[in-house]
Amino acid sequence: MAAPHPALRVHGALSRGVLAVTVLVSLAVLFAPGSDVPSAPPGVDKLVHLLLFLALALTGRWAGIRARPLALLLVAYAGLSEVVQAVSDLQRSGSVSDWLADVAGAGLGLLAWRRLERRRPAR
């Protein structure tokens, strides 16, 4: 197998820092009180969930987390976030469709990383 594209190599503190910021953004988005969540057209919520977990998957892989453990962590995090939203005083509701959007985003991110890994750098 060819070496991965140079842009996809783990970049130590930089990649871990970007992952940490992405996790912090996800915490802010997923656990903001309902009163702080802006209204949006139908479907935007699912797109936000998908893109958020896509970003978590990509930054997690860039930080060197292997695909299978990362996938399991993201599926669990997605489920936990929906349970917390459902049972907490955040004035939010848990949703299976949000969880599915999260899982789809994580899956797309992992697939995109895998595809990019297999590309050869331009010469």
Regions found by a protein language model. Name each.
Residues M1-W99, V103, G107-R123:
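Bulky hydrophobic segments
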